[in-house]
A protein has these predicted regions:
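An N-terminal, helix-rich hydrophobic module
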Residues: 1-117
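Acidic-histidine catalytic/liganding microenvironments
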Residues: 13, 169, 313, 692-695, ...
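Catalytic-center loop of serine/cysteine hydrolases
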Residues: 87-91, 95-128, 160-301, 305
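A structural "domain/chain start" motif
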Residues: 122-156
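Amphipathic alpha-helical repeat elements characteristic of tetratricopeptide repeat
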Residues: 248, 274-285, 300, 343, ...
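Short coil/linker segments at helix-helix boundaries
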Residues: 280-409, 413, 420-443, 468-475, ...
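Alpha-helical protein-protein interaction modules
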Residues: 384, 413-740
């Protein structure tokens, strides 16, 4: 066969032009399918089907173009058309027009797709894209080869400090300590590690201590294929300087291999040594490993080790910072005195920052200090931002920022920060638990429960996950308070002195109108954790419910002394409202939310939660014009408030909040019934009917009284089921007998 003649014949029969036109048109159709089908929620296979059909059609169209010709009399076989009468040149011109037209449409589509579809895709997958494009690494715990288990903390601590050094680099994504240490003591598939932690590279190694010598082996591995990019063994004397030199050498080698660009200040930071004393460093490393359990006794042991570190080396700024944060943890998880703990935290933060004004962990502790002990949420946010600036890859710094945004009523930024923390340390129980809260706020309840189940399976000792799951099951859309109680009680049986479990079991009992059991759990809290704020909060609630107002007031005054007036508005509002002291109930709102008192009132995310209460109190005090104006502005604010797409419950709750202040009894009753029985909004009713500011006209209406009866009938049915469960489990106590 003569190739030139064959190609010439292909051109004459327009086979090449048909192929060109088909390829362009096929590409255009595929692009439209891949961009548009997902927007209409078409199944994945529909796009694949389109691609397969187009692929099959290509050879068929070429065969058709070769075998047939379009003539004035219609389609004929090419061999039946006299070459002198062929009109393939005219057909070719038509195909040229088709090609140009299809190319124009394709160009137009590319522009539209880049502006709209691609932009949306980029926004949706920004985190994933950033994760792929950023150099990323996980530092697995180095293996202790010394044969002495007491050296385990040293190898773990060394790994953590390598991780912390890398985490200071802005252009490097580093998996968090907790996630990386999940693989300790295993021989994991590195591809699995890379996939779970979202990293491309793994740093692993071993540590052997012998007398005053140390041998450290480190190797950098590509996660997807196990390829060793670099490996090195270091034999040195066991001194602080030598250890930090090794850490710096390993870090710089990783940076070189991953082609990470260092900022000038980052380059300087890599050479900094936190201490020159090996004994101080040993004590510090041991403390960092002890405190991770969050058990009060372990936190106390870590505090003792941090104290030892700063006693040996009074210039050890990082140890002061970690010591301060350990006191924060003891306040949260244990039974530390408020005033004493407050003083110790501030003292150690100040000392850390005096030695090193850029100690990121000190700013993390400072953020918690301002929230927990000063109620200064603006300063807390500033400190958390500084911590993230200094420690851009530290998941706990981002977690501190998440908490600070919560107290500053910046919901969107809170969500973004929670996602970032989870991206950095997805197997960290604290951070994953917070991320489940983000999923709940997005009304992705099944995903939240699935995540909590994963935490509970891998870390059954982490009781916060049980408490979070219990809360989700009790809340909409489930409303299963009884089943929620059983879940948390099972966890409580295994750890009956755990503060979180005692509180949560008492919470579920209170929501079931089961106050004898709630009282029992509160007494246990008072026995084990008398200084903890959650204990005081629970006792205040029960005192108010039982009409012991003087005792409730004493607790409110103590909390005010600890936290200041703004953070304790609720306590004094509830205390005075319950007693019919409406002027006194309004006073703290007037003091701390003055914008609600303006004419016209000004609403914002910080004060919107008090607007409905203020309307009711205005009406109780006969200030009806102010009440009507604020009610109007409040409803207008709620109507214009942005609610995330698909967040149906948020929309209903906003409507309910508006109806509650609008003197529209019929619609309010109808919506209450819908929320309780259809949306399963069943938590906090017994407490809410006492504490919440419900308009008098509504409370006095027969319709409302009937709804309350139906609510209690449902709650008491769930309570009866719980009592039966407790008796079947052999857990029942006579003092829990329900008293009407």
């Amino acid at each position: 066969m003569n190739i030139k003649n064959f190609i010439a014949e292909l051109k004459r029969r327009n086979v090449i032009k048909v192929a060109t036109a088909y390829a362009i048109a096929g590409w255009l159709i595929i692009q439209i399918a891949t961009s548009v089908f997902p927007a209409f929620a078409f199944p994945e296979w529909t796009t694949q089907f389109v691609i397969i059909v187009i692929a099959i059609g290509l050879p068929l169209s070429l065969i058709f173009a070769w075998a047939f010709e379009l003539t004035p009399e219609g389609i004929k076989k090419s061999k039946e058309v006299d070459i002198t009468q062929s009109v393939t040149d005219r057909t070719g011109k038509k195909l040229n027009g088709i090609i140009i037209s299809v190319l124009s449409i394709a160009l137009f589509f590319v522009v539209i797709e880049r502006i709209f579809f691609a932009k949306a895709s980029i926004l949706e997958d920004a985190e994933v894209t950033a994760q792929i494009e950023t150099a990323s690494i996980a530092v697995l715990p180095f293996v202790n080869m010394s044969g002495d288990m007491e050296n385990e903390y040293f190898s773990d601590g060394l790994s953590e400090e390598l991780l912390n050094g890398l985490a200071k680099l802005e252009d490097l994504q580093v998996a968090g300590r907790t996630s990386s240490f999940q693989f300790k003591g295993t021989n994991p598939d590195l591809r699995d590690v890379g996939s779970k932690l979202g990293v491309k590279h793994i740093l692993e190694g071993s540590v052997r201590k012998s007398g005053n010598r140390i041998r450290i082996t480190a190797q950098l591995i590509q996660a997807d294929n196990g390829f060793h990019l670099w490996s090195e063994t270091y034999d040195r004397e066991l001194t602080a300087n030598d250890i930090f030199d090794i850490q710096e050498e390993i870090t710089r080698k990783v940076i070189t291999e991953l082609k990470v660009k260092l900022l000038p200040q980052e380059n300087i930071a890599l050479s900094e040594q936190p201490t020159e004393d090996i004994e101080a460093y040993n004590a510090f490393l041991e403390a960092t490993q002890i405190e991770t359990s969050r058990r009060p006794e372990d936190i106390a042991s870590a505090i003792a080790k941090y104290k030892e570190a700063v006693r040996i080396d009074p210039t050890f700024s990082l140890a002061y910072a970690r010591l301060a944060y350990s006191y924060v943890l003891l306040h949260d998880y244990g039974n530390a005195s408020f005033e004493e703990t407050k003083e110790l935290i501030r003292e150690n933060i100040d000392q850390a920052l005096l030695i090193n004004s850029n100690e990121g962990k000190a700013y993390q502790a400072l953020s918690a200090y301002f929230t927990d002990f000063e109620s200064d949420f603006s300063k807390s946010l500033d400190a958390a931002k500084k911590a993230v600036e200094l420690l851009p890859n530290d998941a706990m710094a981002h977690n501190a920022l998440t908490n600070a945004y919560f107290w500053s009523d910046q919901e969107d930024k809170r969500n973004e920060s929670a996602k970032k923390a989870y991206q950095l340390d997805p197997l960290n129980n604290v951070i994953a638990g917070n991320y489940s809260g983000y999923l709940v706020r997005k009304e992705e309840f099944e995903a939240a429960l699935e995540l909590l189940d994963e935490i509970m399976e891998r870390s059954p000792e982490y009781k916060n996950a049980f408490a979070r799951k219990s809360a989700i099951l009790a809340d909409p859309p489930y409303g299963q308070i009884g089943e929620s109680f059983k879940l948390i009680y099972q966890a409580y049986k295994l750890d009956p002195e755990n503060r979180e479990l005692l509180f949560t079991v008492g919470d579920r009992a209170k929501e079931l109108d089961f106050f004898t059991l709630s009282e029992y759990m509160t007494k246990e809290l008072e026995r084990l954790y008398p200084e903890n704020t959650t204990t005081l909060d629970r006792r205040f609630s029960l005192n108010l419910m039982s009409g012991e107002f003087e005792k409730a007031e004493a607790i409110a005054l103590q909390l005010k002394e600890n936290y200041g007036g703004e953070r304790t508005i609720f306590y004094f509002r509830a205390l005075n409202y319950t007693q019919g002291k409406y002027k006194e109930a309004l006073a703290p709102i007037e003091e701390f939310e003055p914008e609600l008192m303006q004419n016209p009132p000004v609403l914002n995310p910080s004060n919107e939660g008090w607007a409905g209460t203020t309307v009711v109190l205005f009406r109780e005090l006969g200030r009806n014009e102010e009440a009507d104006l604020l009610a109007e502005k409040y409803c207008e604010y709620l109507e214009n408030k942005e609610v995330g797409e698909g967040l149906r419950l948020d929309e209903k709750f906003n409507k309910f909040s508006c109806l509650l202040v609008s003197n529209n009894t019929d619609e309010t009753i109808e919506l209450i019934e819908d929320l309780y029985f259809n949306e399963n909004w069943k938590r906090r009713w017994p407490e809410g009917l006492v504490f919440n500011t419900i308009p008098t006209d509504l409370k006095k209406s027969e319709e409302f009284k009937n709804i309350v009866k139906k609510v209690y009938a449902d709650l008491h049915a769930q309570r009866a089921n719980v009592i039966e469960y407790l008796k079947a489990e052999g857990e029942w106590k006579e003092e829990w007998e329900v008293r009407n």
